[in-house]
């Protein structure tokens, strides 16, 4: 959903030319993608989406837009309480940009709790299951807040491993953006619904 992004995070690869040329290419690419999408929407019998905000956007192109709610499959995910010796905060997924998912409040809280001698890295961990690009963003922010010693990074794991990882966690982390009229709209990560389980 291109309109939800604050910038150009929906483009999987950067162009790596001159900055002015990148901006021109991106603007043309966005316009072309939206035109193709909107043309397809106009001829669709029905359109479904998971965001009330997006329903309103898509109704501009097709009056038959339906809202479906996100969730989890109880046959694949059975909540358990597994005790561990550490307090573990877990995040699974991508972090495309700080405009969409921002860990700043978490990192500030960890820094404050460390300063107040409430937590130590040996018993308090934030575990990230992300791609390399996301890890780069997270590392930079963690270092900026002085909380890198609390972080653990892992590659993606098969979907079948996720329920056990979630069940071993003390807290499941859902990141979002701060509300601003110019920021992305309608984002609610599916991780939120996994967390509710």
Language model features: what each stretch is:
Residues 1-35:
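Acceptor-binding helix/loop patch of EC 2.4 sugar-transfer enzymes
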Residues 34-65, 74:
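A short, active-site helix/loop in glycosyltransferases that binds the activated sugar's phosphate group
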Residues 39-42, 140, 158-169, 197:
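Short acidic alpha-helix that forms the nucleotide-activated donor recognition element
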Residues 45, 166-185:
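Acidic donor-binding loop of glycosyltransferase active sites
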Residues 53, 71, 83:
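Carbohydrate-associated surface elements
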Residues 69-78:
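Short beta-strand->alpha-helix junction loop in the catalytic core
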Residues 81-103, 107-110:
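Conserved donor-binding/catalytic core segment of Leloir-type glycosyltransferases
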Residues 123-130, 135-163:
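Nucleotide-activated donor-binding/catalytic signature segment of Leloir-type glycosyltransferases, i.e.
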